[in-house]
Amino acid sequence: MIFAVIDTNVLVSARITKNSSSATVKVLDNMFNGIIIPIFNDEIIAEYTDVLHRPKFRMRDEDINLIINYIKKYGIHSDRIPFDGNMPDEKDRPFYEVSLSVEDSFLVTGNLKHFPVTPKVVTPSQII
């Protein structure tokens, strides 16, 4: 099992891509197959809910609810561990700080530049 915080952009990409063999789709498949165990907190769930419901992504409520309910049921709810360093994008701080709460976990993102450079922060291709 791989424990990981999944950045919102990975979920969005997995759902809107037409490439069923893309790395983001594989991350989501691995999550649903119990290979990747998602780590989350209430802020992360709130962002997932907000972003996935944006009209521009044209996602069905059933698909959004399936993803969010799965994460809440089978994932690990965790608190943030404060990180005093600078973040290129402060809106991403909760994702990074939650990833710090579980030893040997990862943060999977398509936006490496938004996070500190560390082996903990990986792309979808790197985690699959």
Language model features with spans:
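Residues that scaffold the ATP/ADP-binding catalytic core of kinase and kinase-like folds
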Residues: 13-15, 51, 118
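Mid-chain, well-packed structural core segment of small domains
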Residues: 72-104
